[in-house]
Amino acid sequence: MKLSMPRFDQAPVLVVGDVMLDRYWHGGTSRISPEAPVPVVKVDQIEDRPGGAANVALNIAALGAPASLVGVTGDDEAAESLANSLKAAGVLARFQRIANQPTIVKLRVISRHQQLLRIDFEEAFNTDPLALSAEVYSLLDGIKVLVLSDYGKGALRNHQALIQAARKRGIPVLADPKGKDFTIYRGASLITPNLSEFEAIVGHCEDEAQLVTKGAQLMQELDLGALLVTRGEHGMTLLRPDQQALHLPARAREVFDVTGAGDTVISTLAAAIAAGEELPHAVALANLAAGIVVGKLGTAAISAPELRRAIQREEGSERGVLGLEQLLLAVDDARAHKEKIVFTNGCFDILHAGHVTYLEQARALGDRLIVAVNDDASVSRLKGPGRPINSVDRRMAVLAGLGAVDWVISFPEGTPENLLSHVKPDVLVKGGDYGVDQVVGADIVQAYGGDVRVLGLVENSSTTAIVEKIRGQG
């Protein structure tokens, strides 16, 4: 399955569910309390992060998608902390604030990157479902996906009304379910239980075949569009009616903390589906995202650059020969890491020492070097009959093997203006003894503030001379 980065900026998502605040007390531990055999933590940092449905919305916004959130809080400082964090992240949050009841807070005590204790401050909310529904209905017409983030804390009491309202508008509904009654999610487009939650409904599964069979029965009973079972270190399994099960292995390189991993899965799924991705592609992206987030401490979001880099690793496009879509993805990721992009182009028909020196000098002007190579037809037009000596695939393969070169791409035109307009490199480099104003594409690069450099050629190094010498000896 070929992965690519969706257009998240065109994917508005609404999250409805149980909002909570994840609070962290960080500190050092160097002694045992004289009062009891427990460690003493000297707190030196207090950190608040959105949790539950708020973390789902935060993850969606971190990917670059427009995110809205409807939930229930108390009327207290924890609610203010949540509201401020979400506003800073660009999430449109609408809270139903309940007086004389605390916002749900999960307090974790952390020392040396280890969680020592969790303390929960919570009471199940007894909310007015009609008031919450009114907020949701007012936002439905501007979204592409509705997410029900259910932690069983009382914010969601009218699942069916919300699902039916979204379905009437043709809006997919994704639900992260809780509890032992999944009938409340009847008619959802997709539900995402973890294996424990799934088996609490259908019974223990001896193997994957039994999981698939029981999952198919559950989908039929609940009129579900699809079912995604997340299985920890065993990855995840996607089931759809009348289609073969899709098993995806876990992508985590190192598991550090699984807090909020389910939130990351459903948020990435929602944003990708809202961006128009097919479900298998969206699930593959969610699997990559989950592999990233479990390597972080505590409740965390993944950013668009992090997901881009994971896609690059998956597609093998961190270096080498790329198509335009892959190249733009790689360039976006490099820019997100504040790397300077250098671009040069040429025929590179017979690679020689002069080319190698030139490319090393070009690479030294930035952090990443793109080499654009004329394809065979354009070389023939430029150099005449009998050229190129080497096909474009062979020329690019040799260039990609050089340590100075990050990415190689071919182009069919005689000049690289079209590529330059798409890539917008920070530096355009050419070899020769002419002025900057004579460099093809200089006007394009200079128009957006880029730099144009001309490097001197290495003496007695010429592909044309090499070709003529070989032909003369022949």
Swiss-Prot record:
Molecular functions (GO terms): ATP binding; heptose 7-phosphate kinase activity; heptose-1-phosphate adenylyltransferase activity; phosphotransferase activity, alcohol group as acceptor
A GO cellular component annotated for this chain's UniProt record is: cytosol
Residue positions of the active site: D263
| Catalyses which reaction(s) | D-glycero-beta-D-manno-heptose 7-phosphate + ATP = D-glycero-beta-D-manno-heptose 1,7-bisphosphate + ADP + H(+); D-glycero-beta-D-manno-heptose 1-phosphate + ATP + H(+) = ADP-D-glycero-beta-D-manno-heptose + diphosphate
Tell me which UniProt keywords the record has, alphabetically.
Answer: ATP-binding, Carbohydrate metabolism, Kinase, Multifunctional enzyme, Nucleotide-binding, Nucleotidyltransferase, Transferase
Its function, per the record, reads: Catalyzes the ADP transfer from ATP to D-glycero-beta-D-manno-heptose 1-phosphate, yielding ADP-D-glycero-beta-D-manno-heptose.
Protein name as catalogued: Bifunctional protein HldE
Per the UniProt record, the source organism is: Pseudomonas savastanoi pv. phaseolicola (strain 1448A / Race 6)
The record's gene field reads hldE
